[in-house]
């Protein structure tokens, strides 16, 4: 049933690998392909997919009589990997041991995006600018207007931080 189809865990690992290689366009294209909403945009597509359009399927069948049908939607760990691929590897927001690091790998066409991250009682308003149309590579990070290195120590003391990332 999975021959020639989509095995979601491995497909997500391919997305992560694409970002590690700096291929943000391809990574985002694959990310969108796996998105269950993309399998249910029309009534016909929903009938073919046959599973919930709001849950990641463990696999999407490739055999001709089942081609495009999702399977094992509530029985997979793929959703956590999908979330991780999107947040940490494409958008580039990584949190580890009390520090934030921002390393996006995005499509060249994305000129700007924003993330608001709450940690304990603090809020981090993050604006990523990609005016040069790059897939990856951070040239500058400013925290509240001051240039800093890429590791930001998280502070949970009810502060609001403005982070500007230039690619």
Residue ranges and their predicted role:
Residues 1-6, 12-167:
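Non-catalytic C-terminal accessory modules of carbohydrate-active enzymes
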């Amino acid at each position: 049933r999975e021959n020639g189809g989509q095995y979601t865990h491995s497909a997500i690992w391919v997305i992560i690998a694409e970002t590690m290689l700096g291929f943000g366009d391809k990574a985002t294209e694959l990310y969108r392909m796996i998105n269950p909403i993309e399998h249910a945009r029309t009534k016909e597509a929903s009938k073919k997919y046959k599973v919930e359009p709001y849950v990641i399927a463990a696999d999407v069948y490739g055999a001709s009589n089942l081609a495009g049908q999702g399977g094992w939607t509530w029985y997979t760990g793929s959703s956590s990997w999908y979330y991780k691929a999107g947040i940490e590897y494409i958008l580039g927001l990584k949190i580890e041991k009390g520090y934030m690091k921002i390393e996006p790998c995005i499509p060249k066409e994305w000129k700007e995006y924003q993330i608001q991250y709450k940690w304990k009682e603090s809020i981090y308003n993050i604006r990523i600018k990609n005016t040069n149309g790059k897939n990856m590579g951070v040239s500058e990070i400013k925290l509240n207007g001051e240039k800093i290195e890429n590791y930001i120590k998280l502070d949970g003391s009810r502060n609001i931080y403005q982070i500007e990332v230039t690619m």
